[in-house]
């Protein structure tokens, strides 16, 4: 249905405008400049700065363009004396208390207040009284405050309330005593908080990690892609003297709109960590020695060749991070298969691979990211969407805000989402399949169809409650023409993932919903396309004989590892097994940007590679969209782009097809394998492994938002946030009573034969029989599987 148009006149020119639109929206579309401070296209209208006053005929006084709906026949003057006088008066009032410290302000040169003052302000102020001073607040390690500069536009307040879902900043006081603050002295904790830096029209809120490092006009801006979650947020990288100074969002309405997560904004700090490796290293007689690239390649080739001749190519395995570029993923799997091994995997945290042969060509969202705003119902399965994919959580929040979308979940904890949840099933990790079976039973009853035969026994034995029925009713409602069953990291990394996937597919099928995945990393989807899995080559072509998956590689039978961009002790599903496998292998070569103490103990050769901002490459996001990025700064020291390192190493083996001279050459080659791919999440196995739930207390080892990959772990500012301070044991009070841990501060954690001592926190969000102990941390690196039986005792 087309919208009704009316005609208005602005500065003598007629324009068609949608009925009910705000005047400032119409003038912006027409290219007519009207100054503003409080108005932002993504926020609600507050009309409190009064900078956008314009002259509307027949109105007794100037009207704010941001809050004035257009009417048919309206005549507006933006350049009349009445409008100009109103704007100049407003500008003078706004500058009364401003410190005018532009020469030392980080916002200088890109400040809306500067620009508007130059265009609409006077050259002499009538104000001669004392300016007020507002003492700064420490609101955390990410955002620097200078509230004396604040003009009370309230953009930051509305952002927290409307976008982040956490009203952490607010206006305190009235009139000349009004201040923006947190009311209670505390840090801003939202995973999207850094966006207030961009929307602040003055220098009141700036990026703390880059404070006083550079002026806006000194920096060079490069378009790039965020290298962490699978949204593929568009970013700008700002550099000075061949160094990354800061990261800012790049507008893309189809993907990230105008926002980025704090992880994407501040992770660049990790590039300059003290443990950055900048020179090839070779272990000689137990000592690490710097060497030239050619020598390092020769040493690596000789060692691998010796092992292949003695034990066969199948004794060599490779693990690669899914944050790597598509070019790196493709070349590594091509090299591995060139030497005769299919032992390559990027699914390092997954433990159940029993149905991998029937997995989709790549796990994907099943729709465009922007269409999430239109969904009517979503079931989150094993999905902490707010921390795993902050931008996707924002899209779901918009669906809830705009048309009251129904959100429900099946999770091992109440993850404190930033949107309204209608029904939440909090269950212990081993009983997730039982809850899903009950949902599948309710769904089949609703649809009148039978469940898949291999699930019949489990589903028929399930007990359906009113909560299950309400979730199914929401998914299959006539209003829910767009409903989604969305699998997250907890589901994919669950010991019974194949069963969870089959049950989720049944729920989706019987409610006519879309089965969706939110892949963990920036190239988790791309890694499947590139062939970085043991059972498929590039483009999804099935190999004749499947290699070892990531879990099987840790059994102790692999003689040589080629690790790319990973820390096995923090990236693998079983950290203890990963460390053991590395130590027992005859040879380990690591291609990495960072070196750790653990790595120095088990590795034999370390080859320094470039980080995301130092190399060109391609990322495939969760909707299957390919995006390229270029290098913005030179690799530190003697580090080299990963795809070049792989190409040269492959040449050492005299393999064919490794003569690419640019990353684009690699990409064009890979595209030839992906031209006819059909994406379908509904392809599932017709049988799954026997299901038997473990009894007793179980560990839930979610990976915290700032522990997911090598770069973000080294971002100093992010590691000072509350989301990074999570190295503790969390159980609910009921479980604490059962385990006799009430009023205990520290506990001894035992998993398999490994023990550690950690702080105990009572958290009522955790399900019964679950013990939350995060994975991906140094403190938990030696424990064992992220999901499994565990013992917690009083010290």
Regions found by a protein language model. Give the residues of each.
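N-terminal export/assembly segments and adjacent metallocofactor-ligating motifs
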Residues: 2-28, 36, 40, 55-59, ...
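A cross-kingdom feature strongest in bacterial/archaeal respiratory oxidoreductases
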Residues: 34, 39, 315, 333, ...
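A generic structural motif
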Residues: 341-355, 405-413, 510-526, 585-596
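Phosphate/pyrophosphate-binding active-site segments
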Residues: 422-426, 433-491
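Short alpha-helices
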Residues: 411-413, 418-450, 497-500, 506, ...
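Short, structured coil segments at secondary-structure junctions
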Residues: 339-340, 403, 419-421, 503, ...
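Acidic/polar loop patches that form or flank catalytic/metal-binding clefts of enzymes
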Residues: 205-211, 244-246, 314, 318, ...
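A glycine-rich, hydrophobic/aromatic-adjacent loop/helix-cap motif
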Residues: 478-555
């Amino acid at each position: 249905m087309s919208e009704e148009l009316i005609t208005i006149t602005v500065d003598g020119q007629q324009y068609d405008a949608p009925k009910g639109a705000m005047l400032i929206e119409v003038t912006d579309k027409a290219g007519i400049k009207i100054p503003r401070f409080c108005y932002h296209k993504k926020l609600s209208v507050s009309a409190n700065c009064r900078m956008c006053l314009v002259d509307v005929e027949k109105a007794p006084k100037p009207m704010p363009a941001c809050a004035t709906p257009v009417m048919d026949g309206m005549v507006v003057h933006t350049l009349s004396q009445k409008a100009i006088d109103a704007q100049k008066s407003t500008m003078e009032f706004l500058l009364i208390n401003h410190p005018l410290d532009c020469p030392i302000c980080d916002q200088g040169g890109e400040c809306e207040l500067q620009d508007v003052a130059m265009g609409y302000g006077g050259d002499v102020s009538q104000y001669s009284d004392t300016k007020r001073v507002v003492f700064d607040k420490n609101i955390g390690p990410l955002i620097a405050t200078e509230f004396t500069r604040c003009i009370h536009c309230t953009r930051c307040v509305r952002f927290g309330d409307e976008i982040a879902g956490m009203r952490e900043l607010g206006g305190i006081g009235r009139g000349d005593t009004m201040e923006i603050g947190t009311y209670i002295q505390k840090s801003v904790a939202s995973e999207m908080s850094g966006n207030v830096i961009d929307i602040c029209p003055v220098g009141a809120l700036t990026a703390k990690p880059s404070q006083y490092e550079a002026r806006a006009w000194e920096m060079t801006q490069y378009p790039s892609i965020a290298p962490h979650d699978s949204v593929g947020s568009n970013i700008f990288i700002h550099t000075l003297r061949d160094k990354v100074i800061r990261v800012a969002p790049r507008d893309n309405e189809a993907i990230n709109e105008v926002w980025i997560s704090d992880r994407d904004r501040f992770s660049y700090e990790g590039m300059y960590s003290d443990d950055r490796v900048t020179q090839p290293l070779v272990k000689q007689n137990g000592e690490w020695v710097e060497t030239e690239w050619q020598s390092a390649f020769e040493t690596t080739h000789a060692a691998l060749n010796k092992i292949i001749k003695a034990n066969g190519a199948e004794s060599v395995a490779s693990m690669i991070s899914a944050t790597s570029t598509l070019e790196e993923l493709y070349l590594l799997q091509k090299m591995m298969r060139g030497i005769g091994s299919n032992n390559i995997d990027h699914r390092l945290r997954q433990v159940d691979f029993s149905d991998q042969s029937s997995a989709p060509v790549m796990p994907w969202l099943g729709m465009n990211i922007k269409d999430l705003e239109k969904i009517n119902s979503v079931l989150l399965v094993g999905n902490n969407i707010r921390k795993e994919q902050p931008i996707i959580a924002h899209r779901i929040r918009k669906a809830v805000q705009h048309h009251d979308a129904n959100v429900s979940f099946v999770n091992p904890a109440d993850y404190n989402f930033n949107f309204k949840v209608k029904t939440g099933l909090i269950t212990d990790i081993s009983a997730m399949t039982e809850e899903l079976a009950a949902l599948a039973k309710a769904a089949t009853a609703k649809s009148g169809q039978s469940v898949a035969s291999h699930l019949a026994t489990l589903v028929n034995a399930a007990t359906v409650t009113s909560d299950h029925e309400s979730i199914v009713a929401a998914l299959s409602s006539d209003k829910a023409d767009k409903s989604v069953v969305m699998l997250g990291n907890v589901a994919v990394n669950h010991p019974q993932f194949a069963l969870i996937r089959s049950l989720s597919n049944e729920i989706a099928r019987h409610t006519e919903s879309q089965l969706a995945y939110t892949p963990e990393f920036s190239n988790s989807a791309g890694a499947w396309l590139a062939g970085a899995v043991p059972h498929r080559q590039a483009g999804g072509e099935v190999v004749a004989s499947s290699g070892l998956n990531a879990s099987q590689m840790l059994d102790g039978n692999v003689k040589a590892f080629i690790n790319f961009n990973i820390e096995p002790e923090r990236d693998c599903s079983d950290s203890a097994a990963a460390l053991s496998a590395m130590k027992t292998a005859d040879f380990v070569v690591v291609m990495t940007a960072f070196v750790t103490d653990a790595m120095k103990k088990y590795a034999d050769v370390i080859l320094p590679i470039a980080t995301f901002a130092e190399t060109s490459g391609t990322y495939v996001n969760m909707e299957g969209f390919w995006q390229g990025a270029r290098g913005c700064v030179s690799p530190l020291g003697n580090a080299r782009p990963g795809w070049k390192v792989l190409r040269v190493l492959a040449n050492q083996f005299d393999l064919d097809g490794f003569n690419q001279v640019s990353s684009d050459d690699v990409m064009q080659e890979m595209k030839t394998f992906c031209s006819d791919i059909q994406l379908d999440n509904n392809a599932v196995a017709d049988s799954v492994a026997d299901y038997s739930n473990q009894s007793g207390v179980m560990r839930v080892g979610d990976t915290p938002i700032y522990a997911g990959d090598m770069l973000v772990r080294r971002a100093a500012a992010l590691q000072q946030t509350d989301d990074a301070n999570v190295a503790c044991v969390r159980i609910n009070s009921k479980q604490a009573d059962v385990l006799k841990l009430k009023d205990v501060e520290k506990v001894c954690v035992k998993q398999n034969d490994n023990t550690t001592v950690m702080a105990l926190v009572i958290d009522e969000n955790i399900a019964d029989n679950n013990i939350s102990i995060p994975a991906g941390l140094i403190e938990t690196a030696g424990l064992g599987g992220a999901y499994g039986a565990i013992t917690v005792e009083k010290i």
